[in-house]
């Protein structure tokens, strides 16, 4: 899980979603998981 100021899709499997007001990236590749913070 990377915590970043700006979350971006890294590959085509990445999805940007908003959970409880937190922007997250979920992906099949565990390295691509990100959260805004």
From Swiss-Prot:
Annotated NCBIfam families: rpmJ_bact
GO biological process: translation
Keyword Transmembrane helix attributed: no
Organism: Psychromonas ingrahamii (strain DSM 17664 / CCUG 51855 / 37)
Segments forming a coiled coil: none
Record protein name field: Large ribosomal subunit protein bL36
One Pfam assignment: Ribosomal_L36
Family membership noted in the UniProt record: Belongs to the bacterial ribosomal protein bL36 family.
Entries under InterPro entries matching the protein: Ribosomal_bL36, Ribosomal_bL36_sp
Keyword hit for Ribonucleoprotein: yes
């Amino acid at each position: 899980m990377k915590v970043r100021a700006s979350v971006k899709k890294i590959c085509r499997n990445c999805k940007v979603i908003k959970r409880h007001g937190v922007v997250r990236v979920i992906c099949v590749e565990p390295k691509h998981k990100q959260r805004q913070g």
